[in-house]
Amino acid sequence: MKKYLAFSLIIVSLVIIVQNNLLYAQPSLRDPNLTVESFVSGISFPTSMLFLDENNILVLEKDGNVRLVSNGMLQAQPLVSLTVDTKNERGLLGAERVGESVFLYATVKDGEVINRIYKYTLAGAELTNEEVFMDLPGTPATNHQGGKLAVSNDGYLYSVTGELQRDGKDQNIVNGPDPDFSGAILKINPNDGSPAPNNPFQGGNPNDPLNWYQAYGI
């Protein structure tokens, strides 16, 4: 029994070492027509990028900082620093631009843990006029947060929130809780947060989360 336990521990240790080596290894290429080079360094746990123009890129750090890379140089000071919950898969997770507005998706504590979308005005390469755009569920789980934002061809904002291990009706759990904005792709009017008018599940109740759903079961 002792020999078996020792052997098992050795195998587990080797697996962890191999996984860590793969995680931090240099990228490898199988296409000889491609090359890999370092573009910028000094960023901590990047989660998303947003190209503002050909010279300026916003890079999100999981711990709440929005960093600006301008002409290939990482600027010393963050454009925005949010206080976020970084446990497991929580944190500053997504960014998107719609016109002259920039949206950020982050997990925050405001009485309870929630996923919050912030809206900013883009002024040059600065983010101004912070406002809370929309609050979404952030519990029960610390993983499966989602957090990605995108803009549709018709100018609406997409937001993805994971199911948070909630196991609701929108995950085909018959006796589960009703939809609550989790486990879904939302399509949102970027001006006022209302649901896009062509969303497929709109009903008579204006407060029904399904009005915002573009897809569910995420």
Residue ranges of predicted features:
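Beta-propeller blade signature
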Residues: 116-124, 173-191
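Secondary-structure boundary elements
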Residues: 125, 151-158, 187-201, 206-207
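Positively charged n-region of N-terminal signal peptides that target proteins for export
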Residues: 1-4
